[in-house]
Structure formats: C-alpha cells, structure tokens
Amino acid sequence: MKNKLLTAALLAAVLAGCNSQEKKKEENKDKADVVSAPNNQQVDLPAPYATKSVKKYSKVIGWTGEEKPTAPAGFTVSMFADKFVSPRNIYIAPNGDVFIAESNTETKGVKKVKNQLSGKSQSQPSGESANRITILRDANHDGKPELQKIFLSGLNQPFGMLILNNYFYVGNTDGLWRYPYKTGETMIAGKGEKIVNLPAGGYNNHWTRQLLASPDGSKIYISVGSGSNDGEHGMDNEIRRANVLVVDPNGKNEKIYASGLRNPAGITWAPDKKTLWAAVNERDNLGDNLVPDY
C-alpha cells in the first residue's frame, strides 16, 4: 500500500508540473513578441514560456578531512564553526558577537515529492525548521569561537536579526518580535513581544524577513516577499507583500518604503548610508532569454 501511495504521489507531481507549464504557455500565446522600451526603442524578446524552463540543483557534499573551498589568490578559507541545522542568516553585533538564524523552508506531501524528483531536496534542507538563533563568541580573535550555544529558540522561521535600543529584534516569518537585551548576554531569558504582524498564510515560499535599522536608529526596515511566483494566487494574497516595509522601533507607523519587489531577501545600506540596496529574487520559469521581471 505504501509503495502504491508513493507511486501515485510521484505521478501527481509530474502531471502537476506539466499541466502548469502548458497552462502558462496557453495564457501567454497572444502576447506580443516585441515590447516597447524607454525612448521608443524596440527590443526583441521571445514570448514567455516559449521554451521549457530547466533547473539543475547542486548536491551538498560538505567538507571532509582537510578539504577546504578554493579561494581567490590572496585569500584563505577556514571553518569558523559547525554543527548547525540550516544556518540561513548571519548578524554581527556591535560587540563582535555572531548570531546565526537556523531555519528553512518546510515542505510536505506532493510538494516534498516534487522536490525529491527535481533534486531540490539534495541542495537544501526541507524538513522541520530548527527555529532558533545560535550565538558565537570569539573573544580572543583566534578564529575559533570559545562560546557556541542556543541564544533563542521556539521561533517561527527566523531570519532577520537586529540589536537596537536595548532590544534584540527577530524577523519571524509571521511577525517582528523584540526581546529585552543587554550587551554581552548569551541567552534571551526575558519574554518577547510581537510588535508587527506580517503576512505568512497561503503560499509562503518567500518566508524570509530581513531587518535593517536606519542610520539614525529611528526606523526599522522589514523585507517581505511575495505570496506567489507572479501573482497567480490573486492580489488579495499580495497585501503588504513584495515590499520593504518601514516601522518605528515600537512597531508603529508602518509604511511601504518600496514595492513590486518579488522577494527582497537581502537589504542593506549603500556606502553613502543614504541609499537602501535590496537583493531581489525575481520570478521563475519564464523560459530562455527573458529578463526575470516580476
């Protein structure tokens, strides 16, 4: 019975992928191959989905023995710390403490089977998320932390981290939390408070919530990915998504700082501290030779 169920799930996954590709191709068959560009320039582009999208995932093999990643001339690579469960983001505190958010996408059912078929499951973890933050401290600066312990646990897919005004902020997928914090603490003991609710229902593949303080510390910027690949689940599911939001440190006065950003997973300040940079993962599976516009 178990084998029959697995076979059925595999077949369903394959058919779903094929049907999705054909549906998108049919929906876009009447769209023009030529689009208008600034200054009335004409740019020849293929129609969306004119070619089948192909993916090839990497296989994680880790380090063995004395092996190390190859570095450019003049650089070396060494292991700082290990034994993490999906270390997804790094935050370095003003005092030099290093915080690691351990979290990952959680998949189950047909989606999990599709990941196994495509090879995606071998390139990234997809089981239960660790949902914790680990602290590392290298007090003597020898490149090896003397302290490595769980700093905060029981979270919900944490990603962004920030220390501001005696608080430790965490960007969980469903909200911005803050905890009382004193410099040098190695564990959060106080009770936190959720100061901003963030959308996380339905399609939530873009679950990371990066945090960034304004240079003067008066604002906190929060990146929130879209609730879809390209709006296929309806615009009601995109409310407050595909944005960089900005709030006061107490979570009040929320505004949209930037919008139309499919998945702004990384945000930081340019060297001038006046321009916000965002690294955005744009839409997938359009086919060859097309810009990935969202």
What do the PLM-derived regions correspond to, one by one?
Residues 19-21:
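Bacterial signal peptide processing site
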Residues 25-294:
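Beta-propeller domains with acidic blade repeats across secreted/periplasmic ectodomains
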Residues 2-8:
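Sec-dependent signal peptide recognition
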